[in-house]
Structure formats: structure tokens, C-alpha cells
């Protein structure tokens, strides 16, 4: 069944009714034991497995590891190798275009329109290599937690040169106005310089080829603001 959405939560019963042979995704709403007993295999990326501590700092090798694993699952290792070579070429291309010298300080924030709360990302998030490749330094690098609560007080203290706002695809146009409505936001250096960009969270975590697409997207967004 095709659904006009980027993602949806499904139940164990729905999966079994579809007679699936393999489930690729996360455990939310799914009983792994029930799937196993019914002969349905499930694969989740390492980054979303709660029993595995993500590496910090995160690196693009995690993206290539996932591509390799999926290639093994579908018995197309040669195709996976080619995909990884193409990803390496894209990463190298961005790195060559990045500004040399000292890295500009930056933070990534997940914003939900209508909410006064927001989150930021530490060194185990794919934001880490995405920033580094684009000549940016994650100001929350010292925190190895992937995502955690942020505050305007701390943000004002750090006063980043660049701010990357992340959101769901359907909320992109509302994200920056929501952020700018927060008390103190307009005092930030990044806001005053016009160094605030918005992009889809789907282009960051978990580590997949979309992460590389997001890295290219971030490069273009930064370039347009300079």
C-alpha cells in the first residue's frame, strides 16, 4: 500500500496483514518478538538501536556502514560499494569548496512551530560531520548526547555565528518565525548577520545517504547567505 507521507507509525498487526518479509525502520509500535515468531525479519539502523551507544564524534563512515549492511541484506554488495564511492566523491567535493582556516561556530536547533521549547545536537549526531565538512564547528561538540534540551539563556551565552534550524518537511516555512519570536533570539549574532538557515531534519539523522544530501544542501544554504 502506498501512502502520501514521508513516514507513518504502523502496528505489528498491520505489518502482518501486509504479509511483509522484511521490515526496515524503528521499533515504535512494533513487537519484535511477535514479528520474529511470524517469520518477519526486522532491521533498524545502529543509530536507532537503544542497546548500542552511538560513536562520538559521529562520522560519515556510519553512513557507508549502513549502505554496506543494506547491500548485504539485499545481496547487492557491488551496488553498495558503488553507492559508497559516489558518496565519498560528494563529500570530497564539499570539503574542497569549504572555507579554509578557522571554523565558524554554529549550532543546530530542532524547532516545533507553536512550541516554546527547542532542542540541539551533540557530537554523536550527524550534525557533527555535516558541520565540520562545511567549515563549521558545533558549539555543543563537548556533549556526546545526540539530542537534548536547549535554552535561550545558553544560546545567548554561546552566541553562535551560524544557526541551522531543523524541522519536519511540512513545517519549514513556520520554523524561522517561531524561532525569532523567542525572547532574546534577535540579540543573537547569527540573527543580526542573517546567518540563520532552515532545512529538513530528514537530511540529518539517522546516518543514511540523505545525510550526505543534507551536507550538500547545507553548503548551498551557507553559500547563499555569504
Segments from the language model and where they lie:
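A short, structured surface patch at a secondary-structure boundary
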Residues: 1-18, 23, 139
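Alpha-helical, coiled-coil/dimerization segments enriched in small aliphatic residues
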Residues: 2-5, 119-148
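Short helices/loops that flank or line small-molecule/ion binding pockets
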Residues: 9-19, 33, 37-38, 150-159
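Solvent-exposed loop/turn segments at secondary-structure junctions
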Residues: 22, 29-32, 48-51, 111-117, ...
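Structural recognition of the beta-strand scaffold that forms the well-ordered cores
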Residues: 22-25, 42-45, 105-110, 138-140, ...
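Flexible loop/hinge segments that line or gate small-molecule binding clefts
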Residues: 32, 36-69
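Structured C-terminal subdomain patch of bacterial secreted/periplasmic proteins
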Residues: 58-74, 79-81, 158, 162-226
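Basic- and aromatic-lined ligand-binding clefts that recognize polyanionic substrates
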Residues: 73-134
Amino acid at each position: 500500500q502506498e501512502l502520501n507521507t514521508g513516514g507513518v507509525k504502523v502496528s505489528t498487526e498491520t505489518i502482518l496483514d501486509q504479509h511483509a518479509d522484511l521490515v526496515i525502520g524503528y521499533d515504535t509500535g512494533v513487537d519484535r518478538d511477535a514479528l520474529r515468531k511470524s517469520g518477519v525479519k526486522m532491521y533498524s539502523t545502529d543509530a536507532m538501536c537503544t542497546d548500542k551507544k552511538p560513536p562520538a564524534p559521529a562520522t560519515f563512515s556510519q553512513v557507508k556502514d549502513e549502505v554496506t549492511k543494506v547491500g548485504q541484506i539485499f545481496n547487492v554488495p557491488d551496488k553498495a560499494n558503488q553507492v559508497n564511492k559516489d558518496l565519498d566523491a560528494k563529500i570530497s567535493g564539499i570539503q574542497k569548496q569549504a572555507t579554509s582556516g578557522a571554523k565558524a561556530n554554529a549550532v543546530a536547533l530542532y524547532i516545533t512551530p507553536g512550541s516554546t521549547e527547542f532542542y540541539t545536537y551533540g557530537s554523536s549526531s550527524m550534525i557533527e560531520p555535516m558541520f565540520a565538512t562545511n567549515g563549521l564547528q558545533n558549539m555543543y561538540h563537548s556533549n556526546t548526547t545526540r539530542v537534548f534540551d536547549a535554552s535561550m539563556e545558553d544560546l545567548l551565552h554561546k552566541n553562535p555565528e551560524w544557526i541551522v534550524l531543523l524541522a519536519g518537511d511540512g513545517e519549514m516555512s513556520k520554523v524561522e518565525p517561531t524561532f525569532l519570536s523567542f525572547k532574546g533570539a534577535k540579540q543573537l549574532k547569527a540573527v543580526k548577520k542573517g546567518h540563520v538557515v532552515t532545512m529538513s531534519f530528514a537530511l540529518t539523522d539517522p546516518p543514511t545517504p540523505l545525510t550526505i544530501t543534507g551536507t550538500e544542501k547545507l553548503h548551498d544554504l551557507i553559500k547563499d547567505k555569504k
